[in-house]
Regions:
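A structural signal for short, well-ordered beta-strand segments and their strand-loop junctions
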Residues: 72-78, 132-134, 179, 232-236
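Non-catalytic accessory segments adjacent to catalytic cores
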Residues: 56-98
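Aromatic (often tryptophan-rich) hydrophobic motifs at membrane interfaces
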Residues: 60, 174-278
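Short amphipathic alpha-helical segments and helix-helix/interface helices
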Residues: 58-65, 118-121, 163-167, 224, ...
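A conserved beta-strand-loop-helix scaffold within acyl/acetyltransferase catalytic domains
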Residues: 1-42, 81-82, 87-211, 227
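The substrate-binding groove and active-site-proximal loops of carbohydrate-active enzymes
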Residues: 45-53
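Active-site/acyl-donor-binding loops of N-acyltransferases
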Residues: 2-21, 25-28, 33-39, 90-110, ...
Length: 298
C-alpha cells in the first residue's frame, strides 16, 4: 500500500521549520511546533487533514510523544479514510464532529450539478481557458494569488504558507494543478491531491479578475470530469475554524457535491501537568471546547 501523500515524509518536510515526527502505529507524520512565549512544544496533524490508521498501538505513539516532551496533540481527520468514531473516542481525550465535507461520487445516482452551477460554468468558459499545468511553471503567479488571499482573509498560522511549501507540493507526483487563464494570463489555480481512488481539494487562489469572472466554476468542472471515474472527490468544508449558516464557500462546494461526509477534530493531552500549567499561564479553562485551550485567542 502506498503511503498517503498527507502522511508522507515528503509532505511533512514541506512545513519546515516545523519538525516532522513519525507515528509508527498511526502510520502518519505530525508536526512539532513551539508553544508561543514558552520553551515548550506541542504537536499537530499536517494541514489540511491527518490521515491515520486505526491501530491500538497508537497509545505507544502517544507515549513516544510524551517522552519527547510534547504537551498535546491535535489533529483533523480525513473523512474519506478515518477510523470510526468509537476508535477515535476511545483513544483521544477529545473527539468531536468537526466539519461537513462536500463530496462528489459519480457512482451515486444524483451526479448532476445544480442548475445554478451549470449556468456559472457556461458563462465563465466564455471568458477563460482552463487546463492542467505544472505548478512549478506558474509559481510566481500562484504566489501572487495566494499572498493576496492571505492578506484579504487575514490568514495566519500554518496556512500562511511560504514559497518553499508550494515548491515542495509542486514536485509531489500525487498533486495536480488546474488553472484558468484570461487572455493568456494566469487568473486562477487549484491544487488537487490524489490517492488510491480519492481526490482532495487542497488549495485554491485567484486574481481579482479570476474571482470576478468566476473562474473557479470551470476549474471544478474540469476536476470532476478528470477524476470522476473510480474516484471520490472531497471538496472540503466551509471556511474558517467553525461552520457558519452564511457561508458562500460552502454554498459553492455544495452546488457541485452529491454527498456529504463528516470528519472529526481529535485532541490528546500527553502531559497533564504541563497542559494545566500552560492553561493557567494563559488564564484559560483547561476543559474549554477549544483544544488545546492554551492556544485559544481569548
Amino acid at each position: 500500500m502506498r503511503v498517503h501523500p498527507y502522511a508522507s515524509v515528503a509532505y511533512a518536510a514541506a512545513f519546515s521549520p516545523l519538525e516532522p515526527i513519525w507515528l509508527r502505529h498511526a502510520a502518519t507524520h505530525v508536526l512539532k511546533r513551539p508553544v508561543p512565549g514558552t520553551k515548550h512544544h506541542d504537536a499537530m496533524g499536517c494541514y489540511p487533514l491527518c490521515v491515520l490508521q486505526a491501530d491500538d498501538g497508537i497509545e505507544e505513539d502517544f507515549e513516544m510523544l510524551k517522552q519527547a516532551e510534547i504537551a498535546t496533540l491535535v489533529a483533523v481527520t480525513d473523512c474519506l479514510s478515518q477510523p470510526d468514531e468509537a476508535f477515535l473516542a476511545a483513544h483521544f481525550d477529545r473527539c468531536r464532529p468537526y466539519k461537513t465535507h462536500y463530496v462528489y461520487d459519480a457512482s451515486l445516482p444524483n451526479a448532476d450539478y445544480s442548475k445554478h452551477h451549470r449556468d456559472r460554468i457556461r458563462r465563465a468558459r466564455k471568458s477563460c481557458e482552463t487546463r492542467v499545468v505544472k505548478l512549478a511553471d506558474h509559481l510566481d503567479a500562484w504566489m501572487e494569488c495566494y499572498t493576496t488571499l492571505v492578506r484579504k482573509k487575514n490568514i495566519t498560522g500554518i496556512q500562511n504558507f511560504a514559497r518553499s511549501y508550494f515548491q515542495a507540493v509542486a514536485v509531489m507526483p500525487e498533486a495536480t494543478t488546474i488553472a484558468a487563464f484570461v487572455d493568456g494570463a494566469f487568473a486562477s489555480g487549484h491544487i488537487w491531491m490524489r490517492h488510491e481512488g480519492k481526490v482532495y481539494s487542497h488549495l485554491a487562489a485567484s486574481t481579482e479578475l479570476g474571482r470576478k469572472l468566476r473562474c473557479a466554476f470551470p476549474i471544478y468542472d474540469d476536476a470532476i470530469q478528470m477524476f470522476r471515474e473510480g474516484h471520490i472527490i472531497d471538496f472540503g468544508g466551509s471556511a474558517g475554524a467553525e461552520e457558519s449558516a452564511n457561508d458562500g464557500l460552502r454554498d459553492f462546494k455544495q452546488g457541485f457535491a452529491n454527498a456529504e461526509r463528516r470528519n472529526f477534530l481529535c485532541g490528546h493531552i500527553l502531559d497533564f501537568g504541563l497542559y494545566q500549567a500552560l492553561c493557567a499561564r494563559r488564564g484559560v479553562d483547561p476543559a474549554a471546547a477549544f483544544f488545546p485551550a492554551y492556544r485559544s485567542s481569548v
